[in-house]
């Protein structure tokens, strides 16, 4: 579906709460130029590293850090696509702590036409979008809701 938004070709992608890195690795396989996989679990980051090596994808790196901690650092080049698939037990406050730095006024993480994708349980409320980030679509798949947002 992200292919339809035209955001993957050469894109800079952040996969936050990456787990095995499946979402970010899929983006890399579909033409993303640079992918950063971020997960707080050392085991998950090691799995990401193994998956990167086994797939032979260039431009993909894995970082062991909490997403909010990673985002507190310097942004560098802005991201065109941010994928956030946190554990379902992640609190709404913790999710907001991840979303908020994406749109900070100094050194923002998002490119002007970026897409932010948040995957949550259908039992979870809609994310609290910080000022500067606006939902433009959502899609429900069984017990999962995927929310799409963009810079406002």
Which ranges hold each PLM region?
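Class I S-adenosyl-L-methionine-dependent methyltransferase catalytic core
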Residues: 1-152
């Amino acid at each position: 579906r992200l292919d339809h938004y035209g955001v993957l070709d050469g894109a800079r992608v952040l996969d936050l709460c990456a787990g095995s890195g499946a979402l970010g690795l899929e983006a890399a396989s579909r033409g993303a130029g640079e992918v950063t996989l971020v997960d707080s679990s050392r085991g998950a980051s090691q799995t990401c590293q193994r998956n990167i090596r086994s797939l032979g994808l260039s431009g993909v790196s894995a970082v062991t850090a909490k997403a909010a901690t990673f985002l507190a650092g310097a942004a560098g080049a802005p991201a065109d696509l941010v994928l956030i698939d946190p554990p379902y037990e992640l609190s709404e406050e913790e999710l907001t702590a991840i979303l908020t730095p994406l749109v900070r006024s100094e050194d923002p993480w998002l490119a002007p036409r970026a897409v932010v994708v948040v995957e949550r349980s259908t039992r979870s409320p809609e994310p609290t979008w910080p000022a500067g980030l606006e939902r433009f679509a959502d899609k429900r798949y069984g017990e999962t809701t995927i929310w799409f947002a963009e810079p406002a």
